[in-house]
Amino acid sequence: MLGRRKRPPVLAQVPAPAGDSPRLGALGRAELDACRGLATALAGTRSVLATGPARSAVALGLATAATAEGRRVALLECDLASPALAPLLGLSATPGLSEYLRGEAEAPQILQSLVLAGPAAGRATEPLACIVAGAPEPEPAALLDSDRCIHATGKLRRAYDLLVIDGPPTGPGTGPLRALADQVDATIVCGERGTIAKRLPVQVTGLVLFG
């Protein structure tokens, strides 16, 4: 348990973007600079799981910053119970990861591209590859711990320079979080100071303070 280990280091402090949602267009220079610093702190890491209250904003910021540096990046939404990224990014909500894991869609059908523009584009040479969660799945743990999910995350890790997973929350029902933590190189917990859970059932690489 995290409570029995030394508290993980703070890897970055990311200011909250304008507005209430982690929209790509709301990421300003300060947010992108902070996320570049996070990418530097995670240098050598090929796959990152973001959890905590600010997980979506930090996952999107990290994926954007790494793409803007010219890296090939995939952003995978794994909060199957409460999907949120598709409307924020202007992407199709289905089919997504849940349909793929149930065998209702194949990989080419769920992969979407997000072209960076404006300050976020940086030195990007390719679009940000995105896979959204798909239709809500009330019991996601079994799907995320399935051979099909393990195969998918492994394939994404090999195909891209960085895989960023916008993961499930840290609240009750930690099965989905445990399943995904075993499939990545690093797990980061993201949130405002005082809101980050002190005890988690997974090894935590570091904290990202948000706001």
What are these regions (language model features)?
Residues M1-L2, G52:
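Domain-scale detector for complete catalytic domains at protein termini or as standalone homologs
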Residues L2-S21, G134, P201-G211:
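Beta-strand-loop-alpha "switch" segments that mediate conformational coupling across diverse proteins
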Residues V10-S56, A74-R158, P169-G171:
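P-loop/Walker-type NTP enzyme "switch/lid" segment
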Residues S56-A63:
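Motif I (Walker A/P-loop) of helicase-class P-loop NTPases
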Residues A63, T67, L101, R157, ...:
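Gly/Ala-rich phosphate-binding loop of Rossmann-like dinucleotide-binding domains
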Residues P119, A142-G211:
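Conserved catalytic-core segment of NTP-binding enzymes
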